[in-house]
Amino acid sequence: MNTVRVTFLLVFVLAVSLGQADKDENRMEVQEKTEQGKSYLDFAENLLLQKLEELEAKLLEEDSEESRNSRQKRCIGEGVPCDENDPRCCSGLVCLKPTLHGIWYKSYYCYKK
């Protein structure tokens, strides 16, 4: 009986020690793979970041060109007095002398075209 116990104990100790070695090996392999994966992910992340920055620069450039050309400065609305030499009427309005109901004011007003 003792020999069976000793044999069983010996096999158990060997299995545990070999299992620990395999566990350490597996842990090292997993660490190496994650480090390689991290370096690959860092590379992919940097590449994606560069592409996004390029796209953002292009979009901002287009927006700035659009806003520079199409932006309307402060304007005067319909029925508001304006200066005939420097009309600042909004788009779709023209600075004209009033016809009937504003003749006595002697100034120009913004009217629809």
Curated annotation (Swiss-Prot):
UniProt propeptide residues: 22-74
Q: Where in the cell is it found?
A: Secreted
Q: Which UniProt keywords apply?
A: Disulfide bond, Ion channel impairing toxin, Knottin, Secreted, Signal, Toxin
Pfam families attached to this UniProt entry:
Toxin_22 (PF08092)
Q: Which domain of life is it from?
A: Eukaryota
Region forming the signal peptide: 1-21
Q: Which GO terms describe its cellular component?
A: extracellular region
Tissue specificity statement from the Swiss-Prot or TrEMBL entry = Expressed by the venom gland.
Provide the disulphide bond pattern.
Answer: C75-C90, C82-C95, C89-C110
General function of this protein? Probable ion channel inhibitor.
Instruction: Name the family.
Output: Belongs to the neurotoxin 14 (magi-1) family. 01 (HNTX-16) subfamily.
Free-text note regarding domains: The presence of a 'disulfide through disulfide knot' structurally defines this protein as a knottin.
Q: What is this protein called?
A: U11-theraphotoxin-Hhn1a
Q: Which organism is it from?
A: Cyriopagopus hainanus (Chinese bird spider)
